[in-house]
């Protein structure tokens, strides 16, 4: 069975892994980094992903960041006259990670396990799966991030029973899950979270503070300047990271704006205590879901054996202190918060292929599922924190006499009123025979698969007529849309490949020109004028071709110069060999002509010595 890669598709950074033997390995990207920024940039028809896209975000307004926050919505990004869905942007990031894995493994990769926040709803999970398909990946499993982290943490600890709390604060989402580990079984007891809380929000409080300070000092509102805002965002992110290790940091942004008297510079000294004051409300927001997860699991603090911190934002000292205070236990420092989720995804891939044995993963649905009933209320069929996969049926009836159809409004959430919950979709069961209200028997069945994706069936028990759908919310993509996006992605991948090949060719040609110039200089008078002239002409022809856009011309001129330089090198080699032979012959002649002088010698006897 082909390799299944593990991917942590993060809000700010992503990571790709593969199982080697029984150990998950993080694959470095071409820049040598173990994580890749989840950033996509568009410039002159070219798509850039990762570090190169992030670096030019200040000057390029067509840069997309934190797209994960819009998964499962009808949000679109309009760039250069074209609209992109969150699934398409995410697919570009996934495709980049796929290419990284293929370069490392030296083989085609088409299967992956992708992680999502535990609190992702059905629409967000389906959008992630669609993104994988667009990127040319068969998504073998969608796995919750805290569960993946626990899998990576507990794989070598199957000999003991533990209850583990995973506190996952990433770039844009927050989850907390409680798991029971023992005998190779990883059972999720409860999960809670907030999909609109993460590192981006911590950056934002710093940005807001800097904007307010600058306005107070200079009377200029930087929030209205897009380029200034991007510089502030980069500076805020760096300051946040710095304050995890030092007690204060200097934020210096020269020429951030201009006033009546010339350029204006931003200089602010930010202390850790000030940052903690600014972010206090965000940290307190993480405690609500933490308490909820503990309550749902029916556990007290003394029941928790380990607290695992996941996500880059858990490096913030105030976050660590808040978790320690809430749970009353030191946090485990033995896992890398940026990589552990992707490593767990690779392990899950190994479970699927059979490379990892005796591991059973029992996850849960994070939110309750139900349908709207009379009075606009939500009737719950499957409670949150139910182990998946699962199925549940319930019988409903009509609300009025001779009702010909039933509208099934599928909901996900915890509020009592339907309008306050997330609509997953709607469908109708039609052709119900005329009858008094309350007489028809309509059986509604909810199925949740191992990926947490919902299927709903409505069946008229009187006629056995059935209507079955996989939930398609307003933000979901149709099969036709996905197919079109897959083709677009393939075309873009081919175009990107051509661009990479062109860049490589130009670099090779440029390097060849330099080498030829150096070789001609080094050889000096050891090369004939005719040969030198030929090499110079071919070299100049290649330099001229490099100034143009004709790739085939560059390729042919490069080959011509390579041929000339090879012939030249062969000639020089022969000349050097001949010179060495002549030198050796001359040395041999000198040895033969050497004169031998006669010398008298006298034998000395031992008696003469005395």
Swiss-Prot record:
| Key words of the record | ATP-binding, Chaperone, Nucleotide-binding, Phosphoprotein, Stress response
Q: Which residues carry this modification: Phosphothreonine?
A: 173
- Bias-annotated ranges (Basic and acidic residues): 599-610
Q: Region Disordered: which residues? A: 579-610
InterPro entries named in the record:
ATPase_NBD, Chaperone_DnaK, Heat_shock_70_CS, HSP70_C_sf, HSP70_peptide-bd_sf, Hsp_70_fam
Residue ranges, compositional bias (Low complexity): 579-592
Q: Name one GO molecular function term.
A: unfolded protein binding
**What causes induction of this gene?**
By stress conditions e.g. heat shock.
Superkingdom of source: Bacteria
Q: Which Gene3D superfamilies match?
A: 1.20.1270.10, 3.30.420.40, Actin, Chain A, domain 4 (3.90.640.10), Substrate Binding Domain Of DNAk, Chain A, domain 1 (2.60.34.10)
Q: Which SUPFAM superfamilies match?
A: Actin-like ATPase domain, Heat shock protein 70kD (HSP70), C-terminal subdomain, Heat shock protein 70kD (HSP70), peptide-binding domain
Q: Which residues form a coiled coil?
A: none
Q: Which Pfam families match?
A: HSP70
The record's comment on protein family reads: Belongs to the heat shock protein 70 family.
Q: What does this protein do?
A: Acts as a chaperone.
Protein name in the entry: Chaperone protein DnaK
Supply the source organism's classification.
Answer: Bacteria, Bacillati, Bacillota, Bacilli, Bacillales
Q: Quick one: which gene encodes this? A: dnaK
């Amino acid at each position: 069975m082909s390799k299944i890669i593990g991917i942590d598709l993060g809000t700010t950074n992503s990571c790709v892994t593969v199982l080697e033997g029984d150990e998950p390995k993080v694959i470095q990207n071409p820049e040598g980094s173990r994580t890749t920024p989840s950033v996509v940039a568009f410039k002159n028809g070219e798509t850039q992903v990762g570090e190169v896209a992030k670096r030019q975000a200040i000057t390029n307004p067509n840069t997309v960041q934190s797209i994960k926050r819009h998964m499962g919505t009808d949000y679109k990004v309009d760039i250069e006259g074209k609209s992109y869905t969150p699934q398409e942007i995410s697919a570009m990031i996934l495709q980049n990670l796929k290419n990284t894995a293929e370069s490392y493994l030296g083989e085609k990769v088409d299967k992956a396990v992708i992680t999502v926040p535990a609190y992702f709803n059905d629409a967000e999970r389906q959008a992630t799966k669609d993104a994988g398909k667009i990127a040319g990946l068969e998504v073998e499993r969608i796995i919750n991030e805290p569960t993946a982290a626990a899998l990576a943490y507990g794989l070598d600890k199957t000999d003991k029973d533990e209850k583990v709390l995973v506190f996952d604060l990433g770039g844009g989402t927050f989850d907390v899950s409680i798991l029971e580990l023992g005998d190779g079984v990883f059972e999720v007891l409860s999960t809670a979270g907030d999909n609109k809380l993460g590192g981006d929000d911590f950056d934002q409080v710093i940005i807001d503070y800097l904007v307010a300070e600058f306005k107070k000092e200079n009377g200029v509102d930087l929030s209205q300047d897009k380029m200034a805002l991007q510089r502030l965002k980069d500076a805020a992110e760096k300051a946040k990271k710095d304050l995890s290790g030092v007690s204060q940091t200097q934020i210096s942004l020269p020429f951030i704006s201009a006033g009546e008297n010339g350029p204006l510079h931003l200089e602010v000294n930010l202390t850790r205590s000030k940052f903690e004051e600014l972010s206090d409300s965000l940290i307190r927001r993480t405690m609500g879901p933490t308490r909820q997860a503990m309550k749902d699991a029916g556990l007290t603090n003394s029941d928790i054996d380990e607290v695992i911190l996941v996500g880059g934002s858990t490096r913030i000292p105030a976050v660590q202190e808040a978790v320690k205070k809430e749970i009353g236990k030191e946090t485990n420092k033995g896992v890398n918060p940026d990589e552990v989720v992707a490593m767990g995804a690779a392990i899950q891939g190994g479970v699927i292929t059979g490379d990892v044995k005796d591991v059973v993963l029992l996850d849960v649905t994070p939110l309750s599922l139900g349908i709207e009933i009379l009075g606009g209320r939500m009737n719950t069929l499957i409670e949150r924190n139910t182990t998946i996969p699962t199925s549940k049926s319930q019988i409903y009836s009509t609300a009025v006499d001779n009702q010909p159809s039933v509208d099934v409004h599928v909901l996900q959430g915890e509020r009592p009123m339907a309008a306050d919950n997330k609509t997953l979709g709607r469908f109708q069961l039609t052709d119900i025979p005329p009858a008094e209200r309350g007489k028809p028997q309509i059986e509604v069945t909810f199925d949740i698969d191992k990926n947490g994706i919902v299927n709903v069936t409505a069946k008229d028990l009187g006629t056995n007529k059935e209507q079955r759908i996989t939930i398609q919310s307003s933000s979901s993509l149709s099969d036709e849309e996905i197919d079109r996006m897959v083709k677009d992605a393939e075309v873009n991948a081919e175009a990107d490949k051509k661009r990479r090949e062109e860049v490589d060719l130009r670099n090779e040609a440029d390097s060849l020109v330099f080498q030829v110039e150096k070789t001609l200089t080094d050889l000096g008078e050891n090369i004939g004028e005719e040969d030198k002239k030929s090499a110079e002409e071919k070299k100049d022809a290649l330099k001229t071709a490099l100034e143009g856009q004709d790739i085939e011309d560059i390729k042919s001129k490069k080959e011509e110069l390579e041929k000339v330089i090879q012939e030249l090198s062969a000639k020089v080699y022969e000349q050097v060999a001949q010179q060495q032979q002549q030198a050796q012959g001359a040395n041999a002649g000198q040895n033969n002509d050497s004169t031998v002088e006669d010398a008298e010698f006298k034998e000395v006897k031992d008696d003469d010595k005395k």
